[in-house]
C-alpha cells in the first residue's frame, strides 16, 4: 500500500459510522474550514522560517485537510479523492498547452498571459457575469484586493503608468486626514477612507510587482523582531517597558535598527 492509499484508509476509519473517532465523525465542511485556514498559515510560517523539517509535517497536516473534505464529499455522493486529483490534473494540462499540447511559450511572461487568457475563457464557459465572480470572499483582505485589481487589469480597467497610481495614494491620504481633522469625527466615514487608502496602496504594490499580503507579513515580522529586541535591551538595563518614556524607547529602537543594518 502506498502512503496516499494508507492516508485515505486512515481517513475512512476515522469517519467509520460505527468504529470511527467521535470527533472526526461529527465534523462537517463548515467546522473543518477554520482548521484548513490555520494549517495553511502554519505552512506559510514554516516556509518563512525555512524550517523544512517542520514544513514536511505542516504540508502533511494540510494534505489531511484535503483528504478530510474528500471523505466527507464521498460520503455524500458528491466526489472523492480521485475526482479531486483528476480535476487538478485536467486543469494543469489545459492551462499548460505549451507543455501538453502544440502551443508554445518563450518565457514566463507568455506563460502567465496565456494562463490568464485560459482562465478568462473558463469563466466565460461557466456563464459568469463578472470578471470578479469567483474571487473568494474568505481571502485575506490585502490578497483579495490585489486579486480584484488584477482581474480588472486583465480586462483593461487599469492605469498603464505608475504616476496616476502614486497620485491616487496621496489623494487617499488627503481624504483620510480631512476626515480625521473634523471637529466631530465620523468614524464610519473615516473607516471608509482608510479602506480606500489601503486599497490604493495595494494597487501601488501590484504595479511595482510586489504582493501586498507578503510585504505586510514581512513588515509585521520585522517590527516584532525589533520590538522584542527593544524589550530585551530595556530589561537588561533593569527597567520595565511600562516605566520607560517614549523618547528612551525610540532611542533604543533606533539602536536596534542600526544594529540590523550593520549586520
From Swiss-Prot:
Cofactor(s) this protein cannot do without: Mg(2+)
UniProt binding sites for ATP 2: 222-226, 253
User: Could you say which EC number(s) this protein's record lists?
Assistant: 3.6.1.8
Inhibition and activation profile: Inhibited by the MazE-MazF complex.
Residues holding ATP 1: 168-172, 175, 189-192, 196
Subunit and partners: Homodimer. Interacts with Era.
Q: Which PANTHER family match?
A: NUCLEOSIDE TRIPHOSPHATE PYROPHOSPHOHYDROLASE (PTHR30522:SF0)
- According to UniProt, the name of this protein is Nucleoside triphosphate pyrophosphohydrolase
Amino acid at each position: 500500500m502506498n502512503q496516499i492509499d494508507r492516508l485515505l484508509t486512515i481517513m475512512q476509519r476515522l469517519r467509520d459510522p460505527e468504529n470511527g473517532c467521535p470527533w472526526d465523525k461529527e465534523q462537517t465542511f463548515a467546522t473543518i474550514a477554520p482548521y484548513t485556514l490555520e494549517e495553511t498559515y502554519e505552512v506559510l510560517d514554516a516556509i518563512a522560517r525555512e524550517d523544512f523539517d517542520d514544513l514536511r509535517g505542516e504540508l502533511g497536516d494540510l494534505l489531511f485537510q484535503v483528504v478530510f473534505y474528500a471523505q466527507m464529499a464521498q460520503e455524500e455522493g458528491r466526489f472523492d479523492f480521485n475526482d479531486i486529483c483528476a480535476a487538478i490534473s485536467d486543469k494543469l494540462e489545459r492551462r499548460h498547452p505549451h507543455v501538453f499540447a502544440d502551443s508554445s511559450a518563450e518565457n514566463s511572461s507568455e506563460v502567465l498571459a496565456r494562463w490568464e487568457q485560459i482562465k478568462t475563457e473558463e469563466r466565460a464557459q461557466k456563464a459568469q457575469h463578472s470578471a470578479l465572480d469567483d474571487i473568494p470572499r474568505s481571502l485575506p483582505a490585502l490578497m483579495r484586493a490585489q486579486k480584484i485589481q488584477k482581474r480588472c487589469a486583465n480586462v483593461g480597467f487599469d492605469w498603464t503608468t505608475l504616476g496616476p497610481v502614486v497620485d491616487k495614494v496621496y489623494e487617499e491620504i488627503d481624504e483620510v486626514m480631512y476626515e480625521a481633522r473634523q471637529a466631530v469625527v465620523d468614524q464610519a466615514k473615516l473607516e471608509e477612507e482608510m479602506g480606500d487608502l489601503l486599497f490604493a496602496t495595494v494597487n501601488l504594490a501590484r504595479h511595482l510587482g510586489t504582493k501586498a499580503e507578503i510585504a505586510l507579513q514581512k513588515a509585521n515580522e520585522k517590527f516584532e523582531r525589533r520590538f522584542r529586541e527593544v524589550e530585551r535591551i530595556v530589561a537588561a538595563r533593569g527597567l520595565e517597558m511600562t516605566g520607560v518614556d517614549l523618547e528612551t524607547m525610540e532611542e533604543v529602537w533606533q539602536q536596534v535598527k542600526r544594529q540590523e543594518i550593520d549586520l
